[in-house]
């Protein structure tokens, strides 16, 4: 590590400490942090590399020895300072005084998290090591990829491990450190294949070749070509290391001595000495490379990280606002809290039914729906009018065909005409025809009332759901009240509608109104040159309704009927929606406000109403914790930017 100059050492640690601090805050639950993840097939030499970097023994053996993600935080101390270790997992923290205890502590942690046996878990174990002999570096060690399940392992253990690895290396913030033995075909290794699938251009993948002493004779040049990036290209390139083998571990060769032996191995090797001279070999050179890569990666990721934290803070605050602060613990304050909640709800209900914006910010527009319903009601009246006109004209045409006898054109047999075509001779029969047609609209009007009542109920339910999130009893009480008021107001509105139709049985309009409507229709008919809707009704081959005395009389009476129905229809097109809006919106909202506030008089019931859903309580606590850690993360990033803003690792 002597190659790291003083300036570099001063800047590296803050960068790595920043990310370690963010990870310890739990920020990784909310967004991805820059990291180096170590992956490899089983028996790739992954554990040996990590041991060489950290200076401590890690779990070894056959099968899966890394059963949980292991965050290995290494901090370089000054010469002469004591070794320090600490292990943390799922709320547990323990200091480690002796490096020899590290392996045992990791196994204990894995057994507690993943259970005894060979199962794996996604829960992270954090191991912090501070020593003069380690680099400033943080790595995340992941389980080795198993191809075949052994005794005690689930059949899909390989898939479980791959999913876990995928979870880490898919993130753009993660550098994949792929460990591959020199004595296997690099193209067939599952670890490198996984890295290539998520990083096809090799932008964030670094290859580590291990076990160079086991290379078959004659294949050394292939290994050199791989390290020179000439076989499978990775933009971060390759390193090659020789760690302690099983024989050296059995002989208890120290890590310090192993590093010296490694240096001699590469320096003296016929083929590999060039790799050593180029700085591509040995664990110390690997440590330098990894530290530099991590620092570059952190600095590159910081702007995006700051943006993500700001975005998450806003999203979290917005979501937290939905849940509010929860009921106060002090009994004296709980009534005030309840009154505020109920008042806010009833004000939103009144705003909804009067077409104003809701104070809660929820976007509901009931009038856009009602406008469609009432437009459909008007169209129904108009269609009924068209049918009415057509039926009248049809009856007149039928009379002309069947009942005109010996009379010359211009004469009417009044006895026959009065019997067969009532309504054209006396005013009473005229009234009867109008009443009968209008009566047919009564049930459709009541049906429209029920349809609108259901719409209003559903929209008020939405307001209640938004206003009383987390208070199921209060929400239930509000919904029951909305439903009861709907039924009550629907009965009143229906009575008013039926009264309206009873009044419509009185054929009446102002003389001036009727005269204007009749005059307008006459002018329209004169302009069109046809009767009714502009359709000339054929009576026979020699006469029509419009070209003899009978036709003239009938035509005049048709105009009267159509004119009056148009007036009555317009009156109903306005009056029915007014009744519905008044009762189902305005009166319902006012009564809802009154009854909700009256409900608060019952103090015993208030306790029940303020019972909060435990899920909402937990959600609020979760959001508050997230907000707290993200706020701390933002503060850490701000301090970091202010302290070393002018540092540029590219100059190192």
UniProtKB/Swiss-Prot annotation:
Its main location: cytoplasm. Gene3D superfamilies: Dynamin, middle domain, P-loop containing nucleotide triphosphate hydrolases. Residues 242-245 are annotated as: G5 motif. Residues 40-47 are annotated as: G1 motif. GO terms for cellular component: cytoplasm; microtubule; nucleus; plasma membrane; presynapse. Residues 65-67 are annotated as: G2 motif. It comes from the Eukaryota. GO terms for molecular function: GTP binding; GTPase activity; microtubule binding. PROSITE patterns: G_DYNAMIN_1, G_DYNAMIN_2, GED. SMART domains: DYNc (SM00053), GED (SM00302). Residues 141-144 are annotated as: G3 motif. Pfam families: Dynamin_M, Dynamin_N, GED. It is found in: Cytoplasm. GTP binds at residues 40-47, 141-145, 210-213. Residues 30-303 form the Dynamin-type G domain. Induction: By interferons. Residues 554-645 form the GED domain. Residues 210-213 are annotated as: G4 motif. GO terms for biological process: defense response to virus; receptor internalization; synaptic vesicle budding from presynaptic endocytic zone membrane. The keyword Cytoplasm applies. Belongs to the TRAFAC class dynamin-like GTPase superfamily. Dynamin/Fzo/YdjA family. This is Interferon-induced GTP-binding protein Mx.
């Amino acid at each position: 590590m002597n190659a790291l100059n003083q300036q570099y050492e001063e800047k590296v640690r803050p960068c790595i400490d920043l990310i370690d601090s963010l990870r310890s805050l739990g920020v990784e639950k909310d967004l991805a942090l820059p990291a180096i993840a170590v992956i490899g097939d089983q028996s790739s030499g992954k554990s040996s590399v990590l041991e060489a970097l950290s200076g401590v023994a890690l779990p070894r053996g056959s099968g899966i020895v890394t059963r949980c993600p292991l965050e290995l935080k290494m901090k370089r101390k000054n010469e002469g300072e004591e070794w320090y270790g600490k292990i943390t997992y799922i709320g547990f923290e323990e200091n480690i005084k002796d490096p020899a205890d590290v392996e045992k502590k990791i196994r204990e942690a894995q057994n507690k998290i993943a259970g005894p046996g060979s199962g794996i878990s996604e829960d992270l174990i954090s191991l912090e090591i501070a020593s003069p002999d380690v680099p400033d570096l943080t790595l995340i060690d992941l389980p080795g990829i198993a191809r075949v399940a052994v005794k005690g392992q689930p059949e899909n253990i390989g898939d479980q491990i791959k999913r876990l690895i995928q979870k880490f290396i898919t993130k753009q913030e993660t550098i994949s450190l792929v460990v591959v033995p020199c004595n296997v075909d690099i193209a067939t290794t599952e670890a490198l294949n996984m890295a290539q699938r998520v990083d096809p251009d090799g932008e964030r993948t670094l290859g580590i070749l291990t076990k160079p002493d086991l290379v078959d004779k004659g294949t050394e040049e292939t290994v050199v070509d791989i390290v020179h990036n000439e076989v499978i290209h990775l933009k971060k390139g390759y390193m090659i290391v020789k760690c302690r083998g099983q024989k050296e571990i059995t002989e208890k060769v120290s890590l310090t001595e192993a590093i010296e032996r490694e240096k001699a191995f590469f320096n003296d090797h016929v083929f590999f000495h060039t790799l050593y001279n180029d700085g591509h070999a040995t664990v110390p050179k690997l440590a330098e490379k990894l530290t530099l890569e991590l620092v570059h990666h952190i600095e590159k990721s910081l702007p995006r990280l700051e943006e993500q934290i700001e975005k998450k803070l806003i999203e979290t605050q917005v979501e937290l606002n939905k849940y509010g602060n929860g009921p106060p613990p002090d009994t004296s304050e709980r009534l005030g809290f309840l009154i505020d909640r109920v008042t806010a709800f009833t004000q939103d209900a009144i705003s909804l039914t009067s077409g104003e914006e809701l104070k809660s910010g929820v976007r509901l527009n009931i009038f856009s729906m009602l406008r469609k319903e009432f437009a459909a009601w008007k169209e129904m009246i108009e269609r009924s009018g068209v049918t009415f006109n057509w039926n009248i004209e049809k009856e007149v045409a039928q009379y002309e065909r069947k009942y005109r006898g010996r009379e010359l054109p211009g004469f009417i047999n009044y006895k026959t005409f009065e019997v067969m075509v009532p309504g054209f001779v006396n005013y009473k029969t005229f009234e009867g025809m109008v009443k009968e047609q209008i009566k047919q609209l009564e049930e459709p009007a009541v049906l429209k009332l029920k349809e609108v009542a259901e719409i209003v109920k559903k929209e008020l339910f939405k307001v209640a759901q938004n206003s009383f999130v987390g208070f199921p009893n209060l929400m239930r009480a509000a919904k029951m009240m909305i439903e009861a008021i709907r039924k009550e107001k629907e009965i009143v509105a229906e009575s008013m509608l039926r009264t309206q139709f009873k009044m419509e049985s009185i054929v009446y309009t102002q003389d001036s109104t009727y005269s204007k409507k009749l005059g307008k229709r006459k002018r329209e008919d004169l302009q069109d040159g046809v009767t009714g809707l502009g359709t000339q009704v054929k009576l026979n081959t020699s006469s029509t309704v419009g070209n003899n005395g009978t036709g003239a009389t009938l035509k005049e009476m048709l105009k009267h009927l159509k004119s009056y129905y148009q007036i009555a229809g317009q009156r109903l097109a306005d009056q029915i929606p007014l009744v519905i809006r008044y009762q189902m919106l305005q009166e319902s909202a006012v009564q809802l406000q009154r009854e909700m506030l009256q409900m608060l008089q019952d103090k015993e019931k208030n306790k029940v109403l303020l019972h909060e859903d435990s899920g909402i309580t937990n959600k609020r606590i979760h959001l508050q914790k997230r907000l707290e850690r993200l706020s701390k993360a933002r503060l850490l990033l701000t301090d970091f930017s202010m302290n070393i803003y002018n540092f540029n690792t590219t100059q190192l």
